[in-house]
């Protein structure tokens, strides 16, 4: 009797990724502070209430990367800050120069919102630089889907 070779089935997540990032804006932030100090400064500067969300921590290669969340419910906007650097490891290896990733999802975000956010963010003490990231250029963007 001839053995039947089974095919491996591979799940194509490209459509899920596309839909997830369709209404998202990503900001890369260079800041040498520990995550709790960085988030505290963001909360003070923007009058936000980011909180660490333990159930949404991202694990990659036995390293846990913190996630901080805040929702502007009246505007239907969700803010998420991911820690990208943990000691000498990175959540997204392709952007090793970035310490934090700030994702903003929901609502129609006008261009002036982005411009003002970057301007104010660059004024936060200890933030060296911040800029918009293109999620389509990130190979491991699936790690940002919670």
Listing of model-derived features with the role each one plays in the protein:
Residues 10-11, 17-19, 42, 67-72, ...:
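Noncatalytic linker/hinge segments flanking ATPase motor cores
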Residues 2-46:
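N-terminal, charge-rich interaction modules
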Residues 17-20, 54-55, 59, 93-95:
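Conserved functional micro-motifs across diverse proteins
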Residues 1, 51-53, 58-65, 78, ...:
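Acidic, serine/threonine-rich, charge-biased low-complexity segments
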